[in-house]
Each structure stands twice: as structure tokens, then as C-alpha cells.
Amino acid sequence: MYRVYKNNKFILISIPRITNKLWQKNCNLVILLGVLLVLTLFHDPIIVAALGGESNPAVGLFTFGDSYFDGGNKMFNFFWPYGKSRDDPNGKFSDGRIVPDFIAEFMGIPEEIPPVFKTAVDVLRGASFGVADASILGYPATSMTLNQQVDNFRSMKSNWIDDFIGRSLFMIYIGTEDKLNFTKNKPNALLHSLKASKFAIQLLARWVAYQYRDKNTRQGNECYEPLNDLVKQHNEKIGPMLNDLAKTNPGRTSQH
């Protein structure tokens, strides 16, 4: 299913993993979405002109995330069938190209965005910081987190001027590993398998005493309300979740 959500600075776009058959079947739709992505996010004639295929060094593309946006940083997919549609196993989790490759083409970038962990690459027009199995929360420990990818970008920032960075597109796809690991690792389920059957889970308290202070000036006496918003969401959702667990696990009771 294809979906697009946007505001004045961010755009969320849902596109399935590109395969050779899918590309042949939905070529026009993917092209349309790619053009929409660039035109709706940027109202800049330089970028619009670049869509005509003209190489324009004023814009670049940077990608972060997991295997969907891994430009070849996880070095074990250099064999068939990866890259089979181009006869070019390039380390990407696809049969040839991934979504950022098509977006780069729409933006007039002549070469595919290179993986940063590959030596001697040209990052003039951007770079791929995404790594397969990456997660937000960092579990398992062997995976790279989004924060670590951003740190890598920070360490390389001197390669680009601020104006170029401001004009460039930053694409992020991450979260699959976090959801997968959450469904595989459930401490309560483990306790239940060890014969525990009665659970009391206390709701989170409102952070009335937490004071948000500027990290540089150490000033500020206002409560940081975004934390309380998260607490409220947590407390609203945990009850129905526990009820579902009780229904699917006979003999388990819980109170919250």
C-alpha cells in the first residue's frame, strides 16, 4: 500500500520494497511518488530543475536506517540473487536498486548514493549511513542504532557546507528491528512460562517534579510536558494490552 503524509518540513511515504517484478508492474506509480516526494518537500527551483536529469551539485541525498535504506554498508550481500536484475551484487537488500536510488535519480544525482563504510567513495552528492539490522533502541547490541548513524554523519559533516546540507534531502527508514525484537522478547511471557500467573503492573506517575533545564545555562523551572504526554499514552495503552494477554494466556491474571 502506498501512502503519503506531509507537513512543511517532513514527509512520510510508504512504499513496498522494490523488486524487479514490482518495479515493472508499478513503474509509473513509483515515479509519480518519487516526484511528489521531492516537489512537496522542497519548493526550490534548483531541485525542480534537477528532475529533468541535469546533474546539479547544489542538492544531495542522505539516507539513514536499516536494510531498506542500506546502500551497501553491511558487507555480506555481494552474491546472487542480490542485484540479479542488473547482474550487480552490490550489498543492497534488493534485486538491484533500493528506494533511495530511484529518489536520487529523480533529483538528478548521476550516481547512486555510496555507503559510508566503503573505502574511497565520493560523497559529494550525499551518502548512505543506513545499515541492515539497525534499530532505534539498540537491541540486539550487535545492531547499529539511529543515533550512531547520526553520529557518523556528524563526524563527516566537514565534507559538506551548511547551505548544501540545508538543501539536501534526508531519508529515514527504521523501526522494523525494534518491533521484531519486541515481539520476540517478552519478559512477562517468560515469567509466565516459569509458572508465574499473577501480576501487578503499576501505572507510570506524572512527572510533576521533573524540571526542564537548559543544558547550557542550567536555567528553567517549567515541567517538561512532553514527558507527561508520553506517560499518559503509556498508561492509556497498557490496560488493553494486559487484558489481551490475559485472554490469550489462561490462568494469568493482572492488575494495573
Swiss-Prot record:
Keywords, alphabetical: Glycoprotein, Hydrolase, Lipid degradation, Lipid metabolism, Secreted, Signal
GO cellular component, one term: extracellular region
Residue numbers annotated as active site: S67
InterPro entries: GDSL, GDSL_Est/Lipase, SGNH_hydro_sf
EC number from the UniProt entry: 3.1.1.-
Annotated glycosylation sites: N181
Pfam families for the chain: Lipase_GDSL
Annotated GO biological process: lipid catabolic process
Signal peptide (residue range): 1-49
Location(s) in or outside the cell: Secreted
Record-level Gene Ontology MF annotations: hydrolase activity, acting on ester bonds
Domain of life: Eukaryota
Assigned protein family: Belongs to the 'GDSL' lipolytic enzyme family.
Protein name: GDSL esterase/lipase At1g18120
Species this chain originates from: Arabidopsis thaliana
Biological classification of the source: Eukaryota, Viridiplantae, Streptophyta, Embryophyta, Tracheophyta
